[in-house]
């Protein structure tokens, strides 16, 4: 289309453009009236660049064009598009802001821990020189019960041996033994033998140093007689009631004796009808439970209601976890049991640190027992991982210890947990549960750390940070870490 200057009017140019774009052929007729001439345009066909579609091929195209061609509808659609674009832009800005705030809080928490550690090291120089010696002497006196004292004279020992033995000697007529039964699984029998002897010894130990506990009137005469024989000895004076002290003594001195191969093979539960109520219940559960897997031990642990017995079982399981087989990949139930052990040990510093060391020290073999594994191609072997809920529970426990316990400093543990979250997080997509990706934390060994963590893309890390920035529990714990520094200063 070539236009020569002065040859075509504006109306002519407009009609040519309209015809080129929309190809609406029209014919203008002039009708004369009395007052003026009137132009009437008749549209005859539609065959242009924008409306090149035939009405028969797309029957709704003409209706759709009329809808969008209306000024009100066009304004409505444009407003919706602009609004949607604004919402998307706002959400993007909020997400980026939350991610930046989360990273700043992690950095602030780490700086707070480092500053508090420097203050504690500086403050430690002001303590008197004999303070540590006094504290070590008190701890030694506290944790060394009178049972370990070997300063008795030989004459006193001989007199004690002449007294009635506190251990009852059973005859074959007193025991109900099933001679036809054979050992089905050596590890299972060893678990039962070890647990029975430990809990039996603890019940006697507890009733001896604290005779008024557990309603002694409900105990049988035989049990009370054994307790009375033990209370006669002078070496029981000053015996400590701490469960961890008893367990350490029993584990170091008696466990290997009662779990020797010969004793394990011939082990049978005795007639427990004369035992206290709690010990009767324990013997019944040991008899009914095979205790061949960690799930079965979890069932046994869950039925116990005594907090003291649960503490003993927790200490025992940590040292005897090798008796249970490992399930390499499907360990979700075991991780739930680990969370239960952590929750039950919040009030016991020693047990809590034992089980938290499984996560803090990836070389700990117990990670293969409690946590599910992720197969890592760079190292060609499974790598254990923990859930965000398990991590949150551990971090909360150490923060609580730091806030309430002034005897020890847990800043290093908290700092290490924050570093683990920052470096080892990744996304896991569960095909069975359609709830999107979840954040988990890898626990690679030191030799596998670099090849495994380098395979996590930066985009995946960024997505993890976005999810963590919306987690209220994590943000609240990071704020508590910063508040510890403020309160200490």
Swiss-Prot record:
Name of this chain's protein: COX3 mRNA-specific translational activator PET494
Alphabetic keyword roster: Activator, Membrane, Mitochondrion, Mitochondrion inner membrane, Translation regulation
Biological role: Required for the expression of the mitochondrial gene for cytochrome c oxidase subunit III (COX3).
GO cellular component: mitochondrial inner membrane
Membrane topology classification: Peripheral membrane protein
Localization, UniProt: Mitochondrion inner membrane
GO biological process: regulation of translation
The keyword RNA-binding is assigned to this record: no
Coiled-coil blocks: none
Main location: mitochondrion
């Amino acid at each position: 289309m070539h236009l020569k200057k002065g040859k075509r009017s504006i109306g002519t140019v407009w009609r040519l453009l309209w015809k080129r774009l929309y190809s609406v052929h029209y014919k203008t007729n002039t009708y004369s009236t009395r007052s003026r001439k009137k132009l009437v345009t008749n549209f005859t066909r539609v065959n242009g660049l924008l409306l090149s579609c035939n009405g028969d091929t797309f029957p709704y195209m003409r209706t759709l064009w009329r809808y969008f061609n209306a000024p009100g509808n066009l304004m409505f659609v444009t407003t919706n598009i602009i609004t949607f674009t604004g919402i998307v832009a706002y959400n993007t800005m909020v997400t980026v802001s939350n991610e930046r705030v989360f990273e700043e809080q992690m950095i602030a928490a780490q700086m707070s821990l480092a500053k508090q550690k420097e203050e504690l090291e500086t403050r430690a120089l002001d303590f008197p020189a004999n303070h540590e010696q006094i504290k070590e002497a008190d701890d030694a006196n506290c944790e060394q019960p009178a049972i370990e004292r070997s300063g008795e004279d030989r004459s006193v020992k001989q007199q004690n041996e002449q007294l009635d033995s506190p251990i009852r000697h059973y005859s074959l007529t007193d025991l109900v033994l099933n001679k036809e039964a054979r050992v089905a699984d050596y590890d299972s029998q060893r678990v039962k033998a070890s647990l029975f002897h430990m809990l039996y010894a603890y019940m006697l130990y507890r009733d001896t140093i604290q005779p008024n506990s557990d309603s002694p009137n409900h105990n049988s005469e035989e049990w009370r007689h054994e307790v009375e024989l033990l209370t006669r000895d002078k070496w029981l004076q000053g015996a400590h009631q701490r469960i961890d002290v008893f367990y350490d003594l029993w584990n170091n001195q008696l466990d290997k004796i009662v779990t020797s191969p010969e004793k394990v093979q011939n082990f049978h539960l005795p007639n427990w009808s004369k035992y206290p109520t709690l010990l009767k219940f324990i013997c019944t559960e040991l008899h009914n439970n095979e205790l061949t897997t960690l799930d079965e031990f979890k069932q046994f642990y869950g039925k116990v209601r005594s907090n003291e017995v649960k503490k003993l079982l927790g200490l025992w399981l940590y040292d005897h976890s090798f008796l249970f087989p490992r399930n390499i990949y499907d360990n979700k139930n075991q991780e739930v049991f680990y969370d239960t052990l952590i929750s039950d040990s919040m009030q016991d510093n020693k047990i809590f640190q034992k089980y938290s060391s499984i996560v803090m020290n990836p070389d700990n073999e117990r990670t293969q027992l409690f946590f599910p594994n992720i197969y890592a191609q760079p190292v060609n072997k499974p790598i254990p991982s923990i859930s965000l809920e398990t991590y949150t529970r551990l971090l909360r426990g150490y923060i609580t210890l730091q806030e309430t316990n002034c005897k020890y400093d847990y800043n290093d543990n908290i700092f290490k947990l924050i570093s683990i979250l920052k470096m080892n997080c990744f996304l896991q997509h569960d095909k069975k549960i359609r709830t999107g990706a979840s954040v988990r934390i890898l626990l690679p060994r030191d030799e596998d750390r670099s090849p495994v963590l380098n395979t996590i893309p930066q985009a995946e890390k960024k997505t993890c940070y976005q999810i963590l920035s919306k987690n209220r529990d994590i943000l609240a714990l990071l704020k508590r870490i910063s508040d510890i520094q403020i309160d200490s200063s």
